Curated annotation (Swiss-Prot):
PANTHER family cross-referenced by the UniProt entry: CRP FAMILY TRANSCRIPTIONAL REGULATORY PROTEIN, FUMARATE AND NITRATE REDUCTION REGULATORY PROTEIN
Species this protein is from: Escherichia coli (strain K12)
Dimerization, as annotated region: 140-159
Name the UniProt record assigns to this protein: Fumarate and nitrate reduction regulatory protein
Annotated spans, Essential for the oxygen-regulated activity: 20-29
Recorded name of the encoding gene: fnr
Amino acid sequence: MIPEKRIIRRIQSGGCAIHCQDCSISQLCIPFTLNEHELDQLDNIIERKKPIQKGQTLFKAGDELKSLYAIRSGTIKSYTITEQGDEQITGFHLAGDLVGFDAIGSGHHPSFAQALETSMVCEIPFETLDDLSGKMPNLRQQMMRLMSGEIKGDQDMILLLSKKNAEERLAAFIYNLSRRFAQRGFSPREFRLTMTRGDIGNYLGLTVETISRLLGRFQKSGMLAVKGKYITIENNDALAQLAGHTRNVA
């Protein structure tokens, strides 16, 4: 049974409020490993935002770090602007991801965060979270775990761009995306790409034409079925092998 104070807090917060303990992606987010008392303390500092519309930004490069953002649904892309004025995408964030970690060092965001589709986020005031984590070892440990995961993702991306050819880059991107969907309880074999082919090419250092050509090649080989933004993995082993993995995505 849900405690009465939790119900009252939901009513006061509005229709989009979901307690951390009841959130479907809590095991991927900060609440993982926290007990009910700790969850209640965390829940008290979180602001449930209204839907973030496609194209809307959570923060811009140079903005002061005030909050971290936990994605409840949707997709957020992070990007920087080069000296030449070009956009360079640095990541795609899905439900369960936290956005804003890279601002902790300097206190200012080095990048932009923009919604690729209508998204729901929880805004977590950083100073309050930092103070709370000093009193809750489990919370601090989970924060470290999440930051470690982001660092590992950055390292994997560097390796992807430095050692793999165009085919291997795209295969690794689709393979990793399917694994991330699986972690969130979605099908790892059938999913919709929320980012454009131009975004994918920008992220992987490839042209839009190359992305389209490779998707056609993957489909012709029987590895994928592609219909617009929808991807179906037909030959899981072949994709994993091309991506540099030997285990299945499921």
